[in-house]
Amino acid sequence: MRTTIALPALTTSLLALALLATPAAGAAPPALADCGPGELCLWRDAEFKGERQTYDLTGTDIESCVALPKGTTAQALANRTGRPVTAYQSEHCAETGEFQTYPGDGTWTPRSPYRVRAFKIWEH
């Protein structure tokens, strides 16, 4: 007796297996899970690598310039504070250097165009 497998059924099964084995397009690297709701996380290196610093509203004054510790910079950041955050190239939040504001609704920036040395969290 000869067994016949329907090609469409086999194709569908193989496609389903391939989709299960492939990570979701928007899946975040494991390091991103370390930045919790209400936090601003800054990583020393691009792509969320290296030492991570975490700030939240309990220890950070709104609309005040917060310099990173002396000699420390960040090249990746995640803003989950719920408020806009401006990242500055200048350690004094001077607008003569590069700066950019990131929305607070879950912004993930794997590679800043400059080394971040300070930030401000805004009211809204």
Give residue spans per PLM region.
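Compact beta-sheet-dominated domain cores in extracellular/mature segments
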Residues: 2-124
